[in-house]
Amino acid sequence: MATTTRRSDLDGLSALVTGGSRGLGLLLCARLARRGCRVTMAARDADELRRGAAWVEERTGATVSTTVCDVRDRAAVGAMVEQADNRQGGLDVVIANAGVIQIAPVASIDSRAFEDAMSTVFGGTVNTAMAALPPLHRSDVGGRLCLIGSVGGLLAVPHLLPYSCAKAAVGTLGEGLRAETAGKNVSVTTVHPGLMRTGSHLQAEFGGRASKEFAWFSALAGAPVVSMDAERAAERILRALERRRTRLVLTPAARAASVTHGVAPATVTRLSGLAARLLPNPPDGNGEGPAEGGMVQGHDIDRPAHTVTEKVRGWGSALNDRAARRYNQHLPGPPTSG
């Protein structure tokens, strides 16, 4: 019996992805390119963009455009969107994915951590969405705007408070834009992923007892039971865009946490407090951080584990380290193509 390939509603459209040079954004660019989309990949780092574009082109055979842009800069974002709109003959899909993540107890950070998270995660999303809406309204097929939030925006996660606050704002923005663009040729989809194996632990910023914060986060983010394969996550997101869904919460753990928080928020807050007691205590002094995950003292993703503790922790972090190599997160060198 002959088999047929299901045509996607996204096939051949024009797309722009911010934070597209690595991790989830890189995979979204690749899957859009595989669908025959004209893709612009945007990020702050020119070298990362070059490597990311080469990775996508090697895997898909498609050519992607790149734009260096800091999403915190409103004028630069406007120019980026205008350039993609002109170059690609319009815009049909825009995915606001750029962001930063800080991991530290609140006692080890100050207001600047919140300002940084809000300016990049929320401010960058606002800049992208507001610049993208006019060309999306003009789309012949109806524009699709996707905002990447987080389960951390649906409930506060211990040691990720600035990130949670910023992602909560992204979630509210998505709901508001969905309501105000209803019936106006644009659909807005907000995605709230749980933990994903993207290798992002190497790009996150760690404070307090940085090496211990890095250890728990990298292991948990790579654990198969609670984290999601990044390729699968990217495909789920694009399917949600195809169907013009309002909201998507990824991973069973994230969905369970979100539902429980909606029904019994006080109980979830108490459980979060218990979880916080299991995490590293703030240092007495200034601590080790802040430092990017790839620069945390003692971390070497190619170093074998020797102690039992290292082996147990490595069960999760090894998968995340593998994802880091694959998805352009590994700081010392280029990604693999596997």
Residue ranges and their predicted role:
Residues 105-106, 110-115:
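Substrate-binding pocket helix/loop in short-chain dehydrogenase/reductase
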Residues 150:
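Residue(s) in the substrate-gating loop at a strand-loop-helix junction
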Residues 35-51:
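Conserved glycine-rich Rossmann-like NAD(P)H-binding loop of the short-chain dehydrogenase/reductase
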